[in-house]
Each structure stands twice: as C-alpha cells, then as structure tokens.
Regions:
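Surface-exposed, flexible loop/turn segments at secondary-structure boundaries
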Residues: 33-35, 94, 122
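Short beta-strand segments
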Residues: 8-9, 88-92, 117-118
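Active-site histidine-anchored catalytic micro-motif
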Residues: 97-148
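A short acidic-Thr-Gly-centered motif at the start of a beta-strand
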Residues: 1-2
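Short glycine/proline-enriched coil/turn segments at helix->beta-strand junctions
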Residues: 23, 83, 110-112
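N-terminal glycine-rich anion-binding loop in soluble enzyme alpha/beta folds
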Residues: 5-65
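Class I S-adenosyl-L-methionine
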Residues: 38-88, 92-108
C-alpha cells in the first residue's frame, strides 16, 4: 500500500508552480511588511507585483515568518484530507525563524507525523528540495526513507 505523504513549503522556497498546484502540496505564506501594511506573500501580493513596486521606487519592505495560525490551518487541512505523514521544507534557519516555528507547531500535532527539513537555502535552492521530495513520493519511497 502506498503511503499518503504531503509536502508543506514556505513561500520563500521557490518551488515551481506545477508543484505548488498539486493537491498534496501546501504553501504557508511569509509576511511582507510594506508601508504599514502586512501582506501575505503570493496571496496578497504576487512576485510580479512585488518587483513592479520595487522598480517604481517603492520603499524596501521587511519580511517575517508565516503566522502560527496559517501554519496550523495547513496542518488541519492536511489532516482533514487524510494525510498522516508530512515533510515540511523550510528556508534556512540561519535566515528565518520559519524552521523553528514550524518545528514547534509540528511537535504539537498528535495526528500528524511531520518531518521538518532545514534546507540551509533560500529561493530555488530550497524549492529544489521540494522538487526532490515530490520525485521520491512519485517513486513510492516510504516516508521514513524520504526523510533520511
């Protein structure tokens, strides 16, 4: 029997769109703080909109990790969809608190077996971890082997 494995990524892990569109892949949005507003990356503002604003002289924003409620919501969605095993792929813990935050929240989930990966990368470097995990899932790798 094939295991039902999900992938959770943060929005700074630039995984290809085809991967983000899969039912078993969930994305938690980083927060962008810009001119007094808090925007969810790839929800409230697209990468194209972001770069257009920068090009037209907008102030430089700051970012923060996803809200705990958003992460918990994704965990709940996965559980309701019948997933028990989740591989959470995060950008570098040296650049963001996202890894620590997801690790803490994952440890509180009694109905999900969650392996949190610190890619020690950002952007496409982190996104490639998600591509690789997806490839191993398609090849029916068991969850424990996938996590190693």
């Amino acid at each position: 029997m094939t295991e039902k494995i999900a992938i959770l990524i943060d929005s700074c892990s630039d995984a290809p769109q085809y991967l983000q569109d899969k039912d078993y892949v969930k994305t938690v949005s980083m927060q962008i703080h810009w001119d007094g507003k808090v925007l969810r990356d790839r929800v409230d503002i697209s990468p194209d909109q972001f770069y257009r604003k920068i090009k037209h002289g907008a102030s430089i924003p700051t970012t923060s990790s996803p809200q705990s409620g958003d992460i918990l919501e994704k965990f709940q969605e996965l559980e309701k969809e019948g997933y028990r095993d989740v591989i959470a792929i995060c950008i570098s813990s040296g650049l963001s608190t996202t890894y620590n935050q997801i690790s803490l929240l994952a440890s509180q989930q009694s109905n999900l077996n969650i392996k949190v990966i610190d890619t020690k990368n950002i952007g496409i470097g982190s996104g490639l971890f998600a591509v690789y995990a997806d490839d191993l899932i398609k090849k029916s790798f068991p969850f424990q082997k996938l996590c190693n």
